[in-house]
């Protein structure tokens, strides 16, 4: 049996976190002594370890955070078999997201080594959006965020050539893999230096970036999340 302070020290969280986890249903209801002090069991310790391990992953996009929370809720209901199954699904999902992230990097590498395009075809924003199966608003947003600089005609209308189409294709691939706007902006500003390491650039925020999110280190964050999912499965096997 454990007191709140003792079990918090074992897991490495603040005692208030333990109380909040009970309130939110992340662990089973905790019995009280006559003096109203909480008394925790090994089941509570196990549930806290699961929550602590999974919540170290800060990625919120692509349903990842919700899947982790569902595992913790299920474990809190003492449905350990189901929680283990959900963890397997979560691990599979993380591995797919990781593959998507690496595939997007390949798209960038292929783009870099492609021969210059001499095609003279030109598109409006609406046409290029339809071509790439994205919305005109997405294209406008990427322009607004400085991911692409689009030339204008004399009348002020933007016109997209094959060079812009290829760059938009790269941006779309990276965004679909959940890379942040900051990461893509950083990549496109450094892409033409000799032998760029695409993954390193995408995962290395600069000192000039005011806000750094976990998706600015997407590949590394996914690797850490996969490690956490494997650690959680190991807890279920004990």
Model-derived features: positions:
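Internal active-site segments that recognize and position negatively charged phosphoryl groups
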Residues: 130-134
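Arg/Lys-rich, alpha-helical DNA-contact motif
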Residues: 2-11, 23-24, 28-34, 38-124, ...
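Aromatic-anchored, glycine/proline-accented short structural segments
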Residues: 142-176
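Non-catalytic alpha-helical scaffold/packing segments enriched in small hydrophobic residues
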Residues: 127, 137-141, 170
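Major-groove DNA-recognition helix of helix-turn-helix-type DNA-binding domains
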Residues: 16-34, 135-156
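Residues within the helices of the helix-turn-helix
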Residues: 4-5, 19, 126, 140
């Amino acid at each position: 049996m454990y007191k709140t302070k003792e079990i918090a020290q074992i897991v490495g969280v603040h005692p208030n976190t333990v109380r909040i986890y009970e309130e939110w249903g992340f662990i089973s209801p905790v019995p009280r002594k006559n003096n109203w002090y909480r008394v925790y069991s090994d089941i509570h310790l196990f549930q806290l370890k699961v929550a602590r391990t999974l919540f170290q992953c800060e990625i919120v996009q692509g349903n990842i955070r919700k899947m982790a929370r569902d595992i913790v809720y299920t474990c809190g209901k003492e449905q350990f078999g189901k929680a283990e199954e959900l963890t397997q699904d979560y691990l599979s999902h993380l591995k797919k997201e990781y593959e998507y992230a690496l595939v997007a990097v390949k798209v960038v590498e292929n783009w870099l080594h492609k021969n210059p395009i001499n095609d003279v075809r030109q598109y409006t924003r609406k046409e290029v959006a339809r071509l790439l199966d994205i919305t005109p608003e997405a294209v406008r947003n990427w322009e607004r965020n400085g991911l692409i600089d689009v030339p204008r005609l004399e009348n002020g209308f933007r016109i997209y050539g094959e060079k812009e189409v290829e760059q938009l294709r790269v941006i779309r691939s990276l965004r679909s893999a959940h890379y942040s706007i900051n990461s893509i902006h950083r990549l496109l500003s450094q892409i033409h230096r000799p032998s760029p390491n695409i993954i390193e650039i995408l995962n290395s925020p600069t000192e000039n970036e005011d806000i750094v999110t976990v998706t600015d280190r997407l590949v590394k964050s996914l690797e850490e999340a996969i490690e956490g999912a494997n650690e959680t499965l190991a807890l279920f096997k004990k």
